[in-house]
Every structure is written in C-alpha cells, then in structure tokens.
Amino acid sequence: MLSVCIITKNEEHNLARCLKSFQNTGFELVVVDTGSTDQTKKIAAEYTENIYDFPWCDDFSAAKNFAVSKATNPYVMVIDSDEYLQQIDRVQLEKMIAEHPGEVGRIRRINIISGKDGKQENKEWINRIFAKESFHYTGRIHEQVTACDEKEYRTYEAPVVIGHTGYDLPKKEKKAKALRNIRLLEQELKNSGWDAEAHATQLDQNIAKQDTDAEQKSKITDAKKEQQIPYLLYQLGKSYYMAEDYNEACFWFAHGLSYDLEPKLEYVIDMVETYGYA
C-alpha cells in the first residue's frame, strides 16, 4: 500500500539511520540520489534495490516528484535523509489511508536543535502521505504537496512520528545551507513575478472606485496566483534569520505579514514569532 520515498545527496552520515528506522515496517523504500560523491549510494544499497539517479537541477520538487514516480505502491510517504522514524502504528495508518483516500496525511515531526541550554525540540505537523496519482510537489525549495487538479484538499493526522536533525548543524554548515536556500528562494520569487517595490506601492494605494465584475474576477485569479507568495516570503525571512542577517529577515517577514493570512497556519505563527526574535 505504501512506499517511502527519499531524495538524498552526500548524506552518508544520516542515511543509514533514516533507512534503518523504516527497515522493519515492510514499506517499499525508494531512494533517489541527486549527485552524491561520498558513500551515500553504497549505504542505500544495504537497505534497498530501488536506487535511482536524478541530475540535480536546483529544484527539490522535481527531484521528489521523480522519486514518487518510481514508487510501485499507490500511496507514498516522503521522507528526508536527515529524518528518521520514531513511532508508527502501521495498522492504524493503513486504516486511515483507506478511510481518507483523497486526503493528505500529516505526520508529526520533532525538530532537534542545539541551543545555549542544550538540545531543544520543536514539534510540527507536516504533509507527507498521499496518493501518487492525485498529488505532486510544487515549489523549487521548501516544496509543498499540491493536488494535481489544483483544488484545495483536506488533511488528517497520521499515527507517525519522525525525528529531524537537519537544523542541528555546526554554525558554518547552518549558514551555508541558509545561503543556498536564499539563492533558490530568490530565484523562485523572481520567477513568480513578485516585486517588493510594486507590492509596497500596491499596499499604499486606496482604491475608492467600485470594481466591475470583470475586475473582481481578475482579483480572484490574481489572489489564487499569489497564494504561495507569503509562504515564499516567510521562507526567505527564515533563511536570512538562520544566516544571522536579521535586517534582511525583518524585511521579508514584514512583506509576508502584509498579506491577509490565516493566523492559525503554522508558518504564519512561526513567522510572527521569528520576526519578533529578529
């Protein structure tokens, strides 16, 4: 019923832990390598025969969609190399998948971060389980699960808990990762056509006239196109925050929070909190 899909590159220090944690679940393991030069592929071969190469193209969604396409089961759970399974109720999970075929399963992720007071944990729910024929990934970086028909979808909380150490890096590595993310995010924002100056001007305008039906429809269309923009702005702010460039972080957070956002969304809550810290 379920395949676990993983994209990886030079993760010899993390991949064995990841794959070993799923070894006894009975799930198919699919590993896609995007250009490792270390022992990553050799380690993967100890746990699965389903290893594929994908030329890196600065697009995480493209790589993950390729991995999903290689799964032989109708449902997939997408996992990162620096994540590992902590808890799972397989019987309950399969029951929930069967009861929610057109929905996306959210799993509990525990982010482990080193702080001044030692190891700290941050918990969140993330969309990771879905039918491969109905959903795919969009977004060059910090990719999101999107319905193939582009409609909104419902989610359910799956009985799966994973650990994540991707944020628990030495200062130099953490900054390098943040700078890589910034480059990809700025490219994606550029491709979307968003412009900071134009956005600020639009916010300052006070349109007094009554919109025509055509203008209202146009605004609805534009709003749908811009749904991903605040999330990109949040991710840019977060990446600059991780790189310890707090002025830039505040700049992007301010633009992100200028949109009419649902305050209960996890990324909105985190954006407000991190903006305050910055």
Language-model features: where?
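Cell-envelope/extracellular polymer assembly enzymes that use nucleotide-activated donors
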Residues: 1-3, 28
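Catalytic-site signature of metal-activated, phosphate-bearing donor transferases
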Residues: 62-68, 79, 85-251, 255
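Short aromatic/hydrophobic "clamp" motif used to bind/position activated sugar donors
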Residues: 76
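Short, well-formed alpha-helical segments that are part of the catalytic scaffolds
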Residues: 6-25
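A conserved acidic beta->alpha catalytic loop
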Residues: 21, 33-42, 56, 80-84
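Acidic helix N-cap motif at the loop->helix transition within catalytic regions
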Residues: 13-16, 38-47, 88
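Conserved donor nucleotide-binding strand/loop of the catalytic core
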Residues: 27, 41-66, 70
